[in-house]
Structures are given as C-alpha cells and as structure tokens.
Amino acid sequence: MKNDKLGVYNLNSRLQDMLNPADDDKAECRFGDTLFREGDRVMQNKNDYDIIWTRKVYGKPDEEGEGIFNGDIGTIMHIDNISKYVTVLFDDERSADYNFPQLEEIELAYCISIHKSQGSEFPCVVLVLMNGPMMLMTRNILYTAVTRARSNLFIIGSSGCIERMVRNTREKRRYSGLLHFLTELGTEIS
C-alpha cells in the first residue's frame, strides 16, 4: 500500500513538490529513490543511539547528547553536497548532522502511515483511506488514525471503506507466549 498511487511514497513526493518546491536557493541531494531538499519535513525511521545532537539553550551552554529515535520528526535545515552531510532540526529543537550514508535513517514526512503516527498528535490530519487488506482495514486502525488529530480531521476516501473499517472488529490473534513467560517467572495469572 505504501507504493500505491495513494501510498505514502507517492504522496510524499507530490506534497514535497507543492509544499517545498525546488528553488535555486535550496540545496538538494538524492539518496536512493528519495530527493531531499532544504526545508523538507523528515522522520527518523529507526533508532540511532549513537548519532550526536545539540540543542541551543539561550542564556546557557548548549546541550549535547546522543540518540535520535524512530518517529522523531524535524526539518532539513542545511545540505552540504561538498562535505556530504545534512543537518536536521527536530521539533524538540535538537539538531543532528547526518552524513550521506546515514540518510537511510530518515524519510520524507509530509505524509506518514497510520502505523508511524502512533504515539503522535498533529493539529491537522488529512486521512487518505483506500481499500486494502482486511487485516489492515480494522476499526482499531481507524480509531488510531482519527485520534491523531488535535483540532482538524479531513477524511478523503469512500464512505464504504469507512463503514467496512468500522464493522471490521477482527484482530489477528497474537501468539506471543506472554502467559507462558509470566507463568515461568512465577507470576500467578487468574
């Protein structure tokens, strides 16, 4: 679904063109199939415990730490094609430099999947719903999607798709072994 016409990759490319169009004053670099541009919204797509970040704290020494984590969202502030690095300013004011090979850790974030949005809230959400596998088109997924919106929610899709999701209460049974694990630890489960 991510690769479909209304999938995350295509929508990100289209939204990038509209919201952050190419400009002679904005540096760009390509990594794989993704074109990154200064001003782009990006998301960290895996935990990196080693990447160093800094945060300017006015009136105090700069903070420094390690670790940018899956789901952190920010904006590309600078692309240096000579030294081959990209600077991202995250929404919590941490700034991190990525060398070009590290760009595999970030992706455009104009559009993100419902799965990637879990745990986040946004002032405005545009939810694009299309038909998909029943295991992905569930009431719980729809609930997760609509509760990401703090103030405004716009749903693009068919009412039939929404109705099917509301009626689809099936969840795949999980065989995690949790009960066995807790029993082995001596935990009594009633």
Whereabouts are the PLM-identified features?
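Core RecA-like ATPase module of SF1/SF2 helicases and allied nucleic-acid translocases
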Residues: 2-190
